[in-house]
Amino acid sequence: MFAWYKDLGRVDYKECWDLQCSLFDALIERKMSHRTESPTDGEESIGTVLLVEHPAVYTLGKNGKESNLLLGEEYLRSIGADFYRIDRGGDVTFHGEGQIVGYPIIDIEQLGIGLRDYIDALEQSIIDTVAYYGIEAGRLPGASGVWLGSAEEQNLRKICAIGVRASRFVTMHGFALNVSTDLRYFNHINPCGFTDKGVDFGIWEALSQPGIDMLIDLPHTESQL
């Protein structure tokens, strides 16, 4: 069992979204056709994992509230940021330079897990990866993503947003990990719908030779999925 991996570098959001949709539809079609055909010899992939860095863009999930977008679309575009309403779960978030975005388009049924376990695995992959670089992070009950700080000390900051779409156990969209992201872009939104929690990055300062390329392999993802 394996998945194809593609590091796309810096790619426009809409171009990458179109690629995701194409891979997503093709994987569902292949899956459904196999249910009516005889089993084939040989190992097939469970899908494709895309890693990418986007130019500045805001996205709003299908159940998100437009009130969490604090400034109008025209203003966002005036500062060089695009805006899209998309079909993932979650609310509004930002993607931009200094952020690793991962899109696993995979058949999680072949992994023997459901959507909740899949999201848990994504979160744990990020937790383990940032721990490798000396950053202690964790989950927040009742909220997706990966967080720094603690509720007790009232200093929770999200370093990784997660939002997915799934159909017939095939996934798309995924995670966005802040490495050296310009956090000022988050001032224009209530990130992921929260008004009382911030965003952060810590990995950049933890690296002896800073650079987003050092994290692209995400060394703990394979062990979780």
Where on the chain are the PLM-derived regions?
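C-terminal accessory segment of soluble enzyme catalytic cores
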Residues: 184-225
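Histidine/acidic-rich helix-loop-helix segments that form or flank divalent-metal centers
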Residues: 159-162
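Conserved phosphate/anionic-ligand binding catalytic regions in large, soluble enzymes, centered on
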Residues: 168-179
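Active-site donor-binding loop signature of nucleotide-sugar glycosyltransferases
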Residues: 164, 181, 204
